[in-house]
């Protein structure tokens, strides 16, 4: 049995390395939407994760990006998901408020998940639908002609529908998932010959768990995102879990920067996380810092097993 588990762990690690190499070869540039703590709530990276905590789960997150820069992005997020119909289905919802410069965008999405269970793993399929509301505060643009038709159009909030689909495979040692969002490419028209559009986004997430002793483990994970039009982003992370309570880790975002993170199981129901990003690259005239905070709550007590494995 021990030999079988060793072979399984090696095969799992090899699969993760192969997936990571695929991601890094395609990574080219950073895109706008970024989170550094997706490992602690995979629902952020892949909606098919909904219900995986086997109880009602809530999470809030705040991110301040490139602090000290005028008009820098910031984001607030609330998510909730729960299993339904035993463990064969799940439902979830995310509400995200993004701000960058004069633009504010509010996104609300609902997710339905169906799960196929195997002996030691499961495959989840998700469909997501929601609305995206966007508005531009013209007063922050310092425009010379405040009566310009285009500016008046920008100042009006508009909402459009959005749909997506996801698939996620999980076992006790491995997770691999693919997500596609904004598939309908909805757009806004602010004035004649002027507008914007939600481009399709695709993401691939993968991770492997490596036990290193009783109550301790190492998690290696990677996330690659592609935005229609040629924008790529890939990142690689490693975390160490100490005594089933404290996560300490870091990561590298290709051609963008490094990050450090700390998470703590405050109780069997409550967990918190904090990350710090140090960004460098051709797109920055000087180094920039970002901070992200995370707080998650599960309605029922999570077992040591479920706490250890993402």
Q: What function would you assign to each model-found segment?
A:
Residues 2-15:
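Bacterial N-terminal signal peptides that target proteins for export
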